[in-house]
Amino acid sequence: MTWICVITLFALASATLGNKVSRVGVLFPKTRNDNECTARGGLKGSCKSLIDCPSVLATLKDSFPVVCSWNGRFQPIVCCPDAIAPPPVTTTAVTVISTKEPKLPRLHISGCGKRKVKIDITTVGRSGSPILPPISTPQNSTGGRGIIAGGVEAKIGAWPWMAAVFVKNFGIGRFHCAGSIISNKYILSAAHAFLIGGRKLTPTRLAVRVGGHYIKRGQEYPVKDVIIHPHYVEKENYNDIAIIELKEELNFTDLVNPICLPDPETVTDPLKDRIVTAAGWGDLDFSGPRSQVLREVSIPVVPVDKCDQAYEKLNTPSLKNGITNNFLCAGLEEGGKDACQGDSGGPLMLVNNTRWIVVGVVSFGHKCAEEGYPGVYSRVASYLDWIAKVTNSLDHAVTN
């Protein structure tokens, strides 16, 4: 390439000598002496043979040099700059794309997760069954099925965030599902309980009772709306979560208080080997009688991969993607303890320093307390962004 440029210079020079008039942009600047010159860019330089000026040789393909003279017809003497001009400084607008996950909201209602009725944290219910047994020795099934299959009756006031949802027909309310209080206006529940046959239950037909131990007691509140997760699809089990908005605000008492939502830091926590508690008024057995009092059961968390292997055997179309990390699974390997029909929408709870947190929403299972099939819950931590949006960050009633 260099020699092509030299030949080009020679051709240009020949044309110049032949016509005696320069017709190209080759400059012959006047200087104080024959050796000094001004190179392109205004740099001071000295006249040298092209071969002896590497900086000019390097730029021949981009621009013609300043020619001082010719040594014969084939050797141009060029203005070789004494110093190389620094490249021009350019500024380019740079868009920085963060690779970090967006910060999840911290949704805490002041005083949430506290039980105002004094209860021994290691024993609950009339039978004194431990709700937080040692992790290394989880509870064994007694063979009987109580809860919510396999549980015990809760002590009055043990779970002040429990809510019972009723559907009214001709003015008569019928128990429909459960939920958990997360603020004075919102109840967390399951989507599948409110979307039936492609239609959402009319809010005016719904009522929520709180503060009751017996299923037919408690304070009743009308429902303003039910917000179903936008990605929930009927007859599938994914994104099975909903929020009930009440027409009137709840009055918090010893028997009515919100449960805490998970901290953002728990989103990826598998809760391995943790003992969790479910509560509700559901069936005492699969297709069995319904409980008339609030019951509870404590069960260990089952790893998602193990849970997925279990449900893969059923080859059910409602789980086309298997059990994902947006679920939590819990139950005894030998069965005997589980949530059951009617417990849908109720909370799966975890205690942390005496503060109770809703980590799951009762979603589905294979029958109830079936051996080898843990209960499956919508993982609340996976939906914190959606909950914050729907509740307008719990209507700003948030404390960090």
UniProtKB/Swiss-Prot annotation:
It catalyses: Selective cleavage of 98-Arg-|-Ile-99 bond in Limulus proclotting enzyme to form active clotting enzyme. One of its GO terms (cellular component) is extracellular region. Residues 1-23 form the signal peptide. It is an enzyme of class 3 (hydrolase). It comes from Tachypleus tridentatus. The keyword Signal applies. The clip domain consists of 35-55 residues which are 'knitted' together usually by 3 conserved disulfide bonds forming a clip-like compact structure. Belongs to the peptidase S1 family. CLIP subfamily. Residues 148-392 form the Peptidase S1 domain. The keyword Glycoprotein applies. Keywords: Disulfide bond, Glycoprotein, Hemolymph clotting, Hydrolase, Protease, Secreted, Serine protease, Signal, Zymogen. This enzyme is closely associated with an endotoxin-sensitive hemolymph coagulation system which may play important roles in both hemostasis and host defense mechanisms. Its active form catalyzes the activation of proclotting enzyme. Does not activate the mammalian coagulation factors factor IX, factor X, prothrombin, plasminogen, protein C or prekallikrein. Does not hydrolyze fibrinogen. Does not catalyze the activation of factor C or coagulogen. Gene3D superfamilies: Trypsin-like serine proteases (2.40.10.10). This is Clotting factor B.
